[in-house]
Amino acid sequence: MSDLENLLNTGLMSNENGISPETRDLLIDSNFSQVVNYQEDTFIVTQGSEPDALYFTLSGVFHAISHANAQAPQRLLGRIEAGQFVGDITLFDPESTASASVKAMKNASTLKITPDSFKAFCETHPAQALELVSALARGLAARLRAANEKVL
């Protein structure tokens, strides 16, 4: 099974937990996204930089890491595995900077959606865009609940 086929059955891309097959197929269309492969130890997002895309993990594992300053040790915030996403904030707040770095822990691949592609998707497929945004919001809410549990 290919990385893309794996993604179709996991996380936000699965019909059970996220978006419909119709929306998924429209999103995967090459006009709206691209598959990008990464070598181990490659950063796809760097803390403090302007994020450039939403990334759905197809294969491999990424770590979200942060540090308070250049001298502080890195702190592991979480693992991002197949079916999970990062970079979502850039779609909703394009002026933001990345609050953490995201690093491939082994060879990995993602489905990358740029803000311009996301905007085009929203303009040409508004009903499916609403479905995608709702699924992203559920994913963000789940992250927030998990973060609250760690703090409390």
What does each of the following model-derived ranges do?
Residues 1-152:
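Cytosolic regulatory regions built on CNB/CRP/Popeye-like sensor folds
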